[in-house]
Amino acid sequence: MSNIEERVKKIIVEQLGVDEAEVKNESSFVEDLGADSLDTVELVMALEEEFDTEIPDEEAEKITTVQAAIDYVTSNAQ
């Protein structure tokens, strides 16, 4: 597991209050991890802060799974 992947999963566990074992790369934030729209906004904000990046709204809407978050950060982290 890459450092970015570990950090993303740690943020998801903290933000959504889920067990680390539930956080799989293919997990959907809403369907699998029980997030609501506010949770997803807060999750994006936490990712922006952790990785010192800005995620535009149109990109944030596409980040619906753990893997999508990892991929976005990997491609765009500074």
From Swiss-Prot:
GO molecular function: acyl binding; acyl carrier activity
Keyword Protein transport in annotation: no
Compartments in which it is found: Cytoplasm
Superkingdom field: Bacteria
Single GO BP term: lipid A biosynthetic process
Residues covered by the Carrier domain: 2-77
Pathway(s) it belongs to: Lipid metabolism; fatty acid biosynthesis
Biological role stated in the UniProt entry: Carrier of the growing fatty acid chain in fatty acid biosynthesis.
Record-linked HAMAP family: Acyl_carrier
Entries under PANTHER family matching the protein: ACYL CARRIER PROTEIN (PTHR20863), CARRIER DOMAIN-CONTAINING PROTEIN (PTHR20863:SF76)
Family, similarity comment: Belongs to the acyl carrier protein (ACP) family.
Stated name of the protein: Acyl carrier protein
